[in-house]
Design a protein with these regions (language model features):
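Structural detector for helix-capping/boundary residues
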Residues: 3, 149, 187-188
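Conserved N-terminal/central alpha/beta ligand/cofactor-binding core
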Residues: 19, 24-169, 173-177, 198
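Core beta-strand elements of the Rossmann-like FAD/NAD(P) dinucleotide-binding domain
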Residues: 177-188
Length: 199
């Protein structure tokens, strides 16, 4: 559930292993990802990164800016996988700003960062990332994007009366165009729908 950067990135990879259905409560280009104007931070490979930058420095910057709210193992994993994620996005067609002469990425430095490591696509970075991911998802075999499907609840064994274990078996969604409730059965359900305050 969710057609932003997290949901589509996961769905594209998961579709290599089986059928994937992505539910979006609205149009796929209306995700929070598409509205993001800032850049995306990554320590790029040697030769492309700001001299002296590295993953340890990015981790330290993130932990410092996070004021004790970040989990270091999670931060380290995200930072260390950042360059591969940027590579995926560029292979999917995302166009980040580049130096005219050399063709390398234009790297910006923003608050909380000790080095230039922010990639932009003009002032619509999120929209460009979303565009590339949506296009890639639509071209991916085994992947179906369903817009205007609002998830109502998860289907669980507990709700079906099973007492021994409580597992997720799928989701109930409202198809807005028809007003009908639909049931989606699934071996795995991934919640990638933004803030989890009401989960």
């Amino acid at each position: 559930m969710g057609a932003g950067i997290a949901g589509l990135s996961f769905a594209i990879r998961a579709a290599e292993h089986g059928r994937v259905v992505v539910l979006s409560k609205g149009k796929v280009m209306e995700s929070n990802t598409a509205w993001a104007q800032g850049g995306i931070a990554s320590v790029l490979p040697d030769g492309l990164r700001d001299p002296g930058d590295g993953c340890d420095k990015h981790v330290a910057d993130t932990l410092g800016a996070g004021a004790g709210l970040c989990r270091e193992p999670v931060v380290r994993m995200v930072v260390e996988e950042g360059a591969a994620a940027i590579d995926d996005l560029t292979r999917y067609g995302a166009n980040f700003d580049r130096e005219a002469a050399e063709g390398g990425f234009v790297l910006g430095r923003e608050g909380g960062h000790s080095h230039r490591r922010i990639l932009h696509s003009k002032d619509t970075t999120g929209r460009e990332i979303a565009r590339a991911l949506v296009e890639k998802a639509r071209q991916t075999p085994n992947l179906e994007l369903l817009e205007d499907h609002f998830c109502i609840d998860l289907v669980t064994t507990g709700k079906l009366g099973a007492v021994s274990d409580d597992r997720v078996l799928g989701a109930y969604a409202l198809e807005r165009a028809t007003g009908e409730d639909r049931v989606f059965r699934a071996d795995r359900v991934i919640l990638a729908s933004g803030g989890c305050g009401k989960v």
